[in-house]
Every structure is written in C-alpha cells, then in structure tokens.
Amino acid sequence: MDIGSNEILVASDYDRTLASEENNFVISPIVSQKVNEFSKKYKFVVVTGREKKFIDKLAVGLKPTAWILENGSLILFNDREFVLCEKSWFERDRKKIIEILDNLKVRYSIGRIILYVDGYGSKLDMLSEIEKYGRIEVNRNDAMILPKGVDKGVGVLKFKELTGFKGKIIALGDSENDYALFRVADIKVAVANAIPQIKEIADIVTENPNGLGVVEILDKILSGNFGKEVDIY
C-alpha cells in the first residue's frame, strides 16, 4: 500500500538512532542519502537533545524537513527558528539553575536554551533542588535541564501545528529521552541497539542497529511495504 506524502511524519532521534556511537555520531553517507531521498516525498524531522553547533559538524549533508533540537525546545524549519519556552526561563529560571550548579560545583554547558550536565544521570539526588525551576531529563548517563513543559514530544506537536500536519507520526528512538517522543507517536519504532525499556514499549524493533535501522524503516515506507506490515490507519 502506497502511503500518501501527507499521511505520515517520521520523527527520529539522532544519537544511537540515526548515527552510531562507534562512528563518533557522525552521520554515514548511506543514512544521510536515504533520509534526503525520503524527505523529498515525506516529512522527516530529526529530534535530538543536541545543540545546533554540534549537529552542524556531525550531520553534514543531512537535509531533513526540520530539526527539533535541544530536546524539543528549539525548532529549525524553512529558515525560521521557533523557541519553545517562556521569557522567564532566560530571565529567571535558568539563571537560578546555573547558580545552583555553581554552588554544587557541578560541571555543565549551556546550550541556546537548555543546560547539559554530563555524567550525572545516576546522581539526580544532587540535582533535586533544580526541579523548582526546570525539568531534569536523563539520557543514558547524562542529564539535561529543560524549561518545564518542554520535551521531544512537545517539540513534535509544535511542528505539527506549524505545518498543519494531520497524519500519523512514526517515531524512532533508542533511549530514555525518547519516551516523550514515543508518547506522541502513532507507531513507535526502537532500533536494534535500543535499551530494553524502549524495546518493550515499541510497536516495531528493527533488525538493524542505529542508522541502518532507520534506513530499514524508510525503505519499507518508500516501497509501500510498511503499510502491509503495520496498520498505519
């Protein structure tokens, strides 16, 4: 069954989904070529916790429909930028969080919007005071601090609103911060290297890991076979 171009949106995580850790998260030509081919017919968005400056270096040549960066807080689409948080985040909340991190002597980096705390995924008790001002999200052993009410799923829903998209969402992911992405998906796909908790809630687990798992799904959609295996409607 051929699926119409306005009927589906594929939303994919980046690290350990589109790009592998073994390749230092640099997108492979095979994956980027397939995504670019797919994006000419269907909507394909990359939904990642990463900042633009890193994506620009890692994903050279990748041309999705849109980028949803910093865990859903920043959308780049049609040469426009959409920030998904209130002014109070910059004027008050983020400043207070930085003060707390400095007092705890925790190392962090500041993105355009969110804060990154590497290696603190298992030490959330130390960061509990931060939850008065923002939301902590763990991804494997790292933690990201976001404005309240923002996550990958919120970013995807905002993109739907911006484009007037009414079709089905197919989400691909591998780890904890993809729970929010799966929450808004009609079909949830875990790549073969995903953590067990993500595989358990997925509708499909790919045979191949990382980007080859994404290619596997895109090929099925392009060939018309995806609709035969999964009830997209």
UniProtKB/Swiss-Prot annotation:
Q: Which Gene3D superfamilies does the record cross-reference, listed alphabetically?
A: 3.90.1070.10, HAD superfamily/HAD-like
Which positions does UniProt annotate for Mg(2+) binding? 13, 15, 174, 178
**Superkingdom of origin:** Archaea
One GO molecular function term? phosphoglycolate phosphatase activity
Identification of the protein by name: Phosphoglycolate phosphatase 2
Q: Which organism is it from?
A: Saccharolobus solfataricus (strain ATCC 35092 / DSM 1617 / JCM 11322 / P2) (Sulfolobus solfataricus)
Question: Which of UniProt's keywords are assigned here?
Answer: Carbohydrate metabolism, Hydrolase, Magnesium, Metal-binding
Please give the family membership noted in the entry.
Answer: Belongs to the archaeal SPP-like hydrolase family.
Cofactor requirements of the protein: Mg(2+)
